[in-house]
Amino acid sequence: WTRTGNYLFTSEAVDQGYIVLGTETLIVNPQHLGTDGYSSTSILSMNDNGQGLLGIDGIFNGVDMDAGTCGPPASNITCNKTPMFKITDNYGQSWAGDHSAYDFYYVPDEVFEDIFSTWPNTDVDACTGEVSVINDFWSWYEFDMRVDQEGNPHIVISLIAESDNYFHFLDGYTGFYHFTI
């Protein structure tokens, strides 16, 4: 397999014990993502009622993590790394999302800003006394997304405080956060 992107395959039939797969669907187009390597691979969750979620923890096209820049189209969506997902109510025969965000729903900046506003503005290194100004956050690649029996999404991601030079682990603030609707 030499192509990039995330593909969805569905089983069409079983023939003499072999699963016959239908035509592949490019479900996460790499052209819709920012700098390669900063978005996770996709995760899929489906309940018994055919309600499902397919998602990644990633950045939108226009974010260049290496250069530290954010331009369109990401600057019109979000420049942050964020959970991005599509939902289905028919076992993945069709998927829905925000059309203005490459058919992904995503956790908006306002949610992260609300969390960030409760964090301390600085962190003092206990060994050196160096004071770092906390000015951003980061999300590692450890995450999970699931749908419950009512079809509601549940997203768990890591949030780490960031300064100009370091990542900071702040007791009682940084760690795993659970988002749901």
Please tell me what each predicted stretch does:
Residues 1-181:
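Extracellular, repeat-based ectodomains that mediate carbohydrate processing or recognition
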